[in-house]
Regions:
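Intrinsically disordered, low-complexity regions of eukaryotic proteins
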Residues: 4, 17-19, 42-43, 49
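A structural detector for beta-sheet-dominated domains
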Residues: 9, 21-23, 52
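Short aromatic-glycine-(Arg/Gly/Cys) micro-motifs in beta-strand/loop hairpins
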Residues: 1-16
């Protein structure tokens, strides 16, 4: 499994990032969708990147 970093912005302008462990980008998005269900605000944008160890 890889580590995926998702950077997101809410409708009030709050920006943050979370890291999830997933097999691929599609699974990472699915995990993120489950997490944002508990947010008080709507997420208006998000980007997903695979974390690479150097």
């Amino acid at each position: 499994m890889d580590i995926w970093k998702i950077i997101y912005t809410t409708e009030s302008g709050y920006e943050d990032e979370i890291k999830v462990s997933a097999i691929n980008k599609f699974m990472a998005w699915d995990i993120f969708e489950d997490i944002v269900k508990d947010f008080d605000e709507k997420v208006i944008s998000a980007d997903c990147f695979r974390v690479v160890d150097s």
